[in-house]
Amino acid sequence: MGVVDGYWDSSGRADRLSGGSRRIPIDTPSGRFSVWTKRVGNNSDLKVLLLHGGPGATHEYLEACDSYLPAAGVEYYYYDQLGSGFSDQPDDPSLWQLDRFVDEVEQVRAALGLGPDNFVLYGQSWGGLLAIMFEMTSPFSCA
């Protein structure tokens, strides 16, 4: 199997029948909700979690990554934060707190199995702030 074949091979992956999409339950002070993620590619050595701007924007403008990350062999994850895109949309203003969003990123990271040896955060605008705050409060540092 060539490099390209291995990159696109989803056999044995729980999300293989959904095109890489899955919903992840997250716990908040207002109860349990779910957020949407989508995996692209297959690389156990390098995984990138993409954090969109906003809050309230969606992952869609980050789909430009489809133009270059696959060619580099990078496994990456789109993710709509709570209250945006395909994720749950709770009507609770108290959930719009920076610390709560940082905790959400940690819950998503853990559910996706992203560890300190293979995990990079890419954040744009608000997502960049989340990435910085995650790095400052995380029990491990990401690359």
Map each language-model feature to its residues.
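N-terminal type II signal-anchor transmembrane helix
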Residues: M1-G6
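N-terminal cap/lid segment of alpha/beta-hydrolase-fold proteins
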Residues: D9-S34, R39
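Tryptophan-centric aromatic hotspots in well-structured domains and transmembrane helices
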Residues: S18-G20, Y78-Y79, W126
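Conserved HGGG/HGGXW glycine-rich cap/lid loop of the alpha/beta-hydrolase fold
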Residues: T28-Q89
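Structured segments of extracytoplasmic/periplasmic soluble domains
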Residues: Y68, V108-A111, T137
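Active-site loop/oxyanion-hole signature of alpha/beta-hydrolase fold enzymes
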Residues: S84-Y122, W126
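Conserved hydrolase catalytic core segment
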Residues: P116-A143
